[in-house]
Swiss-Prot record:
Purpose of the protein: Component of the EKC/KEOPS complex that is required for the formation of a threonylcarbamoyl group on adenosine at position 37 (t(6)A37) in tRNAs that read codons beginning with adenine. The complex is probably involved in the transfer of the threonylcarbamoyl moiety of threonylcarbamoyl-AMP (TC-AMP) to the N6 group of A37. Kae1 likely plays a direct catalytic role in this reaction, but requires other protein(s) of the complex to fulfill this activity. The EKC/KEOPS complex also promotes both telomere uncapping and telomere elongation.
Keywords assigned by UniProt, alphabetized: Activator, Acyltransferase, Cytoplasm, Metal-binding, Nucleus, Transcription, Transcription regulation, Transferase, tRNA processing
Binding site for a divalent metal cation: 121, 125, 142, 313
Any Gene Ontology biological process: positive regulation of transcription by RNA polymerase II
HAMAP family found in the cross-reference section: Kae1
SUPFAM superfamilies the UniProt entry points to: Actin-like ATPase domain (SSF53067)
Pfam family, one: TsaD
Keyword Lyase: no
Stated name of the protein: tRNA N6-adenosine threonylcarbamoyltransferase
Protein species of origin: Neurospora crassa (strain ATCC 24698 / 74-OR23-1A / CBS 708.71 / DSM 1257 / FGSC 987)
Necessary cofactors: a divalent metal cation
Gene Ontology cellular-component annotations: chromatin; cytoplasm; EKC/KEOPS complex; nucleus
Keyword Acyltransferase on entry: yes
EC number: 2.3.1.234
Length: 354
């Protein structure tokens, strides 16, 4: 039921990858404004040169769920009785981590007598991005470790106009960070970004794979790995000149981001939009925002992006999207509160939008 101020309040649980996030949000019944009450996150960080395995990540989420939930509740300043629903990430994501957090969400729902709402991870990113930036009806570029999609809203669905044909752009960057044995703290993609800022002297030729509004990153990763092996062996680059890890990171970023800008611009022309909203962990990258901004400015448009509190996986986006669905009457029965590693963005009926 609404709190003393008439607000609906939701607690959201996210754990589709290596970040465990729990957040609490309130919706103002008059203005419709979303108010972030708390947004707590804990990240599983693996050693340099390695990725995060599902079993280890799931173990981390199980170990930290209670303390993160307690902290989120304490920071929010609300009581358990004021919370209307418990929202959790249904998918897509890694099976083990998803399941660990879903079990935690079910436990809270049963302990507190609250209703459950399963949320699509991508829709959570989109709705949080719209709420924070004020973007009205943008073309959405969703870029993360597990997803790369160009999306636009139409007829109560977030339609996918283009996507990766193999691996996600974030996965490409993360895997190359392993090749160079770059630290995973705070995130491999962030550390590649910082290293790329030291490059720029050399732009190495890497495969550029765009097919209409779709793109591919496996070929460019393979070529970047080959060049890294040459560099470690002391061999010169294709032009006979030596190159550094910074040059490799710079070249990789410039190429993959140019691909993303191209397919986003094509989608903007197709749907007639002059707004771009960048969501997902890779959306924090300042160079991507800069390149996208230059393209949008040439079209008389604008780019919207959030900071790391909201573009990196978090619980508050799940709470927000879940509460939007809850307010339309959507519920997830306990016996249907499963998880799925495959959950397409356009499968969700977006009842809360016209």
């Amino acid at each position: 039921m609404p709190d003393a101020k008439g607000r609906r309040i939701a607690l959201g649980c996210e754990g589709s990858a290596n970040k465990l996030g729990i957040g609490i949000i309130a919706h103002d019944p008059i203005t419709g404004e979303a108010l972030v009450l708390s947004n707590v996150r804990d990240t599983f960080v693996s050693p340099p040169g390695t990725g995060f395995l599902p079993k280890d990540t799931a173990r981390h989420h199980r170990a930290y769920f209670v303390r993160v939930a307690k902290k989120a509740l304490a920071l929010s300043g609300v009581s358990i009785s004021e919370i209307d629903c418990i929202c959790y990430t249904k998918g897509p994501g890694m099976g083990g981590p998803l399941t660990s957090v879903a079990v935690g969400a079910r436990t809270l729902a049963l302990l507190w007598g609250k209703e459950l709402v399963g949320v699509n991870h991508c829709v959570g990113h989109i709705e949080m991005g719209r709420a924070i930036t004020g973007a009205s009806n943008p073309v959405v570029l969703y870029v993360s470790g597990g997803n790369t999609q160009v999306i636009a809203y139409a007829e109560q669905r977030y339609r996918i106009f283009g996507e990766t044909l193999d691996i996600a752009v974030g996965n490409c960057l993360d895997r190359f960070a392993r090749t160079l044995e770059i630290s995973n703290d705070p995130a491999p993609g962030y550390n590649i970004e910082q290293l790329a800022k030291q490059g720029g002297r050399v732009l190495l030729d890497l495969p550029y794979a765009v097919k209409g509004m779709d793109c591919s990153f496996s070929g460019i990763l393979g070529r970047a790995d080959d060049l890294a092996a040459q560099m470690k062996a002391g061999e010169p680059g294709p032009d006979g000149e030596p190159f550094t890890p910074a040059d490799l990171c710079f070249s990789l970023q410039e190429t993959v981001f140019a691909m993303l800008v191209e397919i986003t611009e094509r989608a903007m022309a197709h749907v007639g939009s002059n707004q771009v909203l960048i969501v997902g962990g890779v959306g924090c990258n300042e160079r991507l925002q800069e390149m996208m901004g230059a393209m949008a400015a040439e079209r008389g448009g604008s780019v919207y992006a959030t900071d790391e509190r909201f573009c990196i996986d978090n619980g508050i986006m799940i709470a927000h999207a879940g509460l939007l669905a809850y307010e339309t009457g959507f519920r997830t029965p306990l016996d249907e509160s499963t998880c799925t590693q495959r959950f397409r963005t356009d499968e969700v009926f977006v009842k809360w939008r016209d």
